[in-house]
Amino acid sequence: MTESESASGMDGVVLGGTASGVGKTVATLAVARALADAGHDVQPAKAGPDFIDPSHHEPVVGTPSRSLDPWLSGTDGMRRTYHQGDGDVCVVEGMMGLYDGSVASTARVASELDLPVVLVVDASAGMQSVAATALGFQAYAAEASVDVDVAGVLAQRAHGGRHADGIRDALPDSLTYFGRVPPRDDLDVPDRHLGLHMGSEAAIDDDAVDAAAAHVAAKRIADVARTPPRPPAHDPAPDTGQTVAVADDAAFCFAYPATRERLRERADVVTFSPVAGDDLPACDGVYLPGGYPELHTDALADAPALDTLGARAADGLPVLGECGGLMALAESLTTTDGDTAEMAGVLPADVRMQDRYQALDHVELRATGDTLTAGSGATLRGHEFHYSAATVASDARFAFAVERGDGIDGDHDGLTEYRTLGTYAHVHPESTAFDAFLDAL
């Protein structure tokens, strides 16, 4: 749906948590299902840069989830991304606790979109204390100097009967009871490094989501939802007439829907699966998103696509790889078990998986010269989260100096060779990085 097509606006709410691990993802699925059952066309979204939680939204709602992050895309870009959604109500899953995060908290997302917050509170061992917690979160907005409307509570892991009644009765008039999510083992999502399993790998049981949705007050949530402000008009960039090959499989699954949309707006997009044995299609440029190449090293080592990619890159084909894409473009990738597999061999680095994450933050990069995604001196904002470390050759060339974050070696990001660029940073299309990439084809 284009901005003009959604001129009537899309109401929305933000599900903010009291802390990480409180059950926001499951609560989001329950609310989305309840609203859909009530006749609404639901657009899911995620506050922040995460790729994994949104993968659980689409199987339940049937619509790709939008990523809303003011650091990655700016306020106008975030509002534009929101209004490019497709539905009459948007359910935005928050990240971490409501006020947590120095540059892109859930509270900031809610404030800049002017959306009310439904506070997800773990009610497994409390009743009146749930109300006290919610009241504290409501009052803290003034202390944090952020304009956040905490509208009420969704009680996570709450039983019915006296438990639910006690929570509801304890809430002051300023806080609405929006229902509960019952404690059920089949609502748990298994996790691993980088977070939960992807929705395509470990989808939450659909009957369990239905059971949880039955206890959500969908009408109350729809009644408090409201429409964010619109950004200034934005003229789309012209079609390049070029073809971009995008890797799309379990090893390369971290791509924002907005990124795929921007690529399709300005180029012909062909997808391929290196893991499944697809060769690199005929194309004018390649995008390798992040994902889990470390879980598919054998398949990638045998993939004809990586051999072809190495040869085409050496001939000057523009190639952009982010995080997992960077790893696949390296000389080798070693798992935590010590197994080493050859990769495409385009970038002068050997990558090894670590037991602990090596970087997790929003980042800011400054281009030290003209590169695929930015002109010399330009800055890009992104996000990094990875468990791998790259050992680079002494003559390796970097495209970016790190102003915030860790990058590849603490000071630099963006290994570059030929017309290939590999970064640990993930960027959003509103950063202009993908437009620069397309213009370079």
Swiss-Prot record:
Matching SUPFAM superfamilies: Class I glutamine amidotransferase-like, P-loop containing nucleoside triphosphate hydrolases
Gene Ontology biological-process entries: cobalamin biosynthetic process
The reaction(s) this protein catalyses: cob(II)yrinate + 2 L-glutamine + 2 ATP + 2 H2O = cob(II)yrinate a,c diamide + 2 L-glutamate + 2 ADP + 2 phosphate + 2 H(+)
Recorded superkingdom: Archaea
Metabolic or biological pathway, per its Swiss-Prot or TrEMBL entry: Cofactor biosynthesis; adenosylcobalamin biosynthesis; cob(II)yrinate a,c-diamide from sirohydrochlorin (anaerobic route): step 10/10
Stored HAMAP family: CobB_CbiA
Official protein name in the record: Cobyrinate a,c-diamide synthase
Provenance organism: Halobacterium salinarum (strain ATCC 700922 / JCM 11081 / NRC-1)
